[in-house]
C-alpha cells in the first residue's frame, strides 16, 4: 500500500510545521509549501530530528500563478494529491482569543 500524499500549505512555521511533521511521522508523504524554499531550514531540521522527510514546494497562496506552479511541481513529482491541509495565513498580532472578528478574518482572507 502506498503512503497518502498530503500537501500542507504554510508549512514553514507554527501549526503548519507541526502538522506537516505529525503527518510525516504517521506515514504520509508530505509536501510542505513555503513562500521561499531557501528559508525552510527549521522545517527541514525539525523533520530530520523526527526521522522523517518533508518535500518542499515553493508556493505563495496569495499569488494564483505561484499556486499553479507549485501544484504542477507537486503533481509532477508525486502524480497525485490525496489530502490538502489549507493552513497558510498571514500572521496576526497576539493570541487568537484576543483578536476581534475583523482581525481574525484578515488572517484567513489571503489575497
Report residues per predicted region.
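A conserved hydrophobic alpha-helix of the Rossmann-fold in NAD(P)-dependent oxidoreductases
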Residues: 40-43, 67-74
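Short alpha-helix in the Rossmann-fold core of NAD(P)-dependent oxidoreductases
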Residues: 108-111
Amino acid at each position: 500500500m502506498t503512503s497518502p500524499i498530503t500537501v500542507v500549505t504554510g508549512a514553514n512555521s507554527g501549526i503548519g510545521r507541526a502538522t506537516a511533521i505529525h503527518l510525516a511521522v504517521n506515514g504520509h508523504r508530505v509536501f510542505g509549501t513555503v513562500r521561499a524554499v531557501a528559508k525552510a531550514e527549521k522545517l527541514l531540521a525539525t523533520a530530520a530530528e523526527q526521522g522523517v522527510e518533508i518535500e518542499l514546494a515553493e508556493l505563495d497562496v496569495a499569488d494564483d500563478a505561484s499556486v499553479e506552479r507549485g501544484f504542477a511541481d507537486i503533481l509532477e513529482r508525486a502524480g497525485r494529491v490525496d489530502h490538502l491541509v489549507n493552513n497558510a495565513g498571514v500572521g496576526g498580532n497576539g493570541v487568537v482569543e484576543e483578536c476581534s472578528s475583523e482581525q481574525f478574518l484578515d488572517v484567513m482572507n489571503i489575497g
